[in-house]
């Protein structure tokens, strides 16, 4: 009994060819990083000063209320965290793309 196995030829690609990413993807993530950076700066500047920091030295601490945070402040906190996480993820992806292109 003769065992005959015909396999399809295996084509090996170089790892650099399979990992290269087009410049449009890098440009897209770079633009997203700029947008997230500007949005994050705006959101951080919209927060009220909590006191005890640099905002206290320049008069920002006098405006903070004694009561709890309002719904708008809590939503601003949540939006800031989400934009911050998106900013961080964008930086990580850009770093991996730059490493893959080298």
Swiss-Prot record:
Subcellular location: Cell membrane
Chain ranges passing through the membrane: 25-45, 79-99
GO molecular function: protein-transporting ATPase activity
Record carries keyword Transmembrane helix: yes
Protein family: Belongs to the SecG family.
NCBIfam families: secG (TIGR00810)
The protein's name in its UniProt record: Protein-export membrane protein SecG
UniProt organism field: Streptomyces coelicolor (strain ATCC BAA-471 / A3(2) / M145)
């Amino acid at each position: 009994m003769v065992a005959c196995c015909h396999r399809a030829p295996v084509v090996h690609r170089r790892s650099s060819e399979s990992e290269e990413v087009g410049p449009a993807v890098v440009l897209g993530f770079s633009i997203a990083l700029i947008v997230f950076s500007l949005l994050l700066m705006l959101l951080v500047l919209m927060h009220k000063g909590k006191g005890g920091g640099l905002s206290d030295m320049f008069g920002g601490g006098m405006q903070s209320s004694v009561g709890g945070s309002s719904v708008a402040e809590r939503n601003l906190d949540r939006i800031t965290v989400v934009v911050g996480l998106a900013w961080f993820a964008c930086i990580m992806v850009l770093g991996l793309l730059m490493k893959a292109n080298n």
